[in-house]
Amino acid sequence: SEMCIRDSNLRGRKMNSLRKRGIIIFSILSLVIVACGGAAEEEVVEETVEEAVVESLDSPAVTTATAVKTGTGVTAEPCPAEIGGVPTGADQNKGCIYLGLLNDYTGPYAPAGPGLELAQRAFWLWANGAGGIGEYSVAIREGFDTGYNPQKHLEGYTAIKDEVAALAMSLGTPQTLFILDEMDKDNMVGVPMSWWSGWSYKENDKGLIVEFGSQYCADGMNAVDWSLENLGDIKTVGIMGFAGDYGSDWAAGVAKAAEANGLTVAWTYTPPSTEFDVAQAVGLMVTQPVDAYFPAISAGLMAQVAGGAAQQGLTPFAILAGPSFNDAFVQEGFPLKGLFESGAIYAMGLGVAPYEADTPGHAVMRATMSQIVESANAFLVAGWSSQYHLKGVLEAAYKGGDISRAGIRRAAANVTVSSDGMMEPRELGQDRADTAAYIGIPDGSIGSGQRVLAFN
């Protein structure tokens, strides 16, 4: 991806060892093995208490307005007490800001969808209890099943857009890109559940996408650099992935770092996800052996590729993109548990500190989630952390006196957001990608299935 490659800050930062720290990494797909791989017219209500001067959100300083402009998806009536089987924690004396949810319940990422959604709803349960957004609580409406299909994604967007002020989640990069023009017409800001490097640049996302975590391309670069520093003599590598935002973005980062380090790329296999052939992937490893390979595929296919290569007597180092790993790989009874714990396989995180990390944000997440579900899986971390930056955007919009969709969009274009330590603070709208990365080794003795080795 050109977006990733052109950023000179994406590589060359040495990853710090975590061998002496008891921190556990998470990988984004870790519940079960999955084979995945015209403008809307807003009705604006204004309550004018007194004439007030409100500074633009383009200014570093924003005064708190005495009158707040509202619009589509914002009501004076309180949020429901429960949506989607999860309490909203809404203050019944406050109004409600509604968010939309474009999820996958029946497609390749169906195993991920419920966990992501549960954590997002739990986040706002906590946030509402902590005061909400000024005189408003926040609630996520019932999710729409897109099946990870762009056309269904558009259908879902069309169905919910007149009822929400922003999107709590739009799962999938191609799917989100497919609706981006409509989002632009509607001033609809949204959180992606993907880590495409292009989300960091306004020329791609029109200033509408509230990204979080590191990007696939940066992770690919960091994976190569770390492997060369820690895994011995690596001279020949292979690159494997799905064509598109995920695999191609990762492949671009791996290729760039390989070139910079003088490595030979023996082969690159990046077909569309629907055309990925395990036999062909294993065949490349057999006919053109490599010292290490870097896959960005689904967890289900990853197990087949690693297992197929091992059956042929091949166990080169493998440094996986986060979605290629699954904690089921190291659970008791899984046939390839020994292979994944052999020291030949490693996996990147996705730029969010792991579940057991010692930050205020993680502590709040664990305390809240433990009241709802007994689990430490990665979907919860990804879902919860995805909402922090949106919360910051809504807070900025409210402070600026405009929580209409136009006001929310303006806030998203220029605001510094934080996450109680879960991620580094980020200034949105700056055409700059995050580079924080985690890398871990599969370990079945740990709840999340991986032990962190390094971060940067």
Predicted regions and their residues:
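Beta-alpha junction/loop-to-helix N-cap segments that form part of ligand/metal-binding clefts
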Residues: 84-87, 111-118, 130-203, 212, ...
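Extracytoplasmic "Venus flytrap"
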Residues: 74, 79-93, 100-121, 143-150, ...
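Extracellular/periplasmic bilobal clamshell ligand-binding domains
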Residues: 389-456
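Bacterial lipoprotein signal-peptidase II cleavage site
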Residues: 37-45
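Short, small-residue-biased leader/transition segments that mark boundaries at the very start
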Residues: 1-5
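Extracellular/periplasmic periplasmic-binding protein-like sensory domains
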Residues: 309-384, 442, 450-454
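Extracellular/periplasmic ligand-binding modules, especially the Venus flytrap/periplasmic-binding
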Residues: 252-255, 299, 304, 354-411
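Extracytoplasmic ligand/sensor domains, especially the bilobed periplasmic-binding protein
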Residues: 82-85, 164-269, 317-342
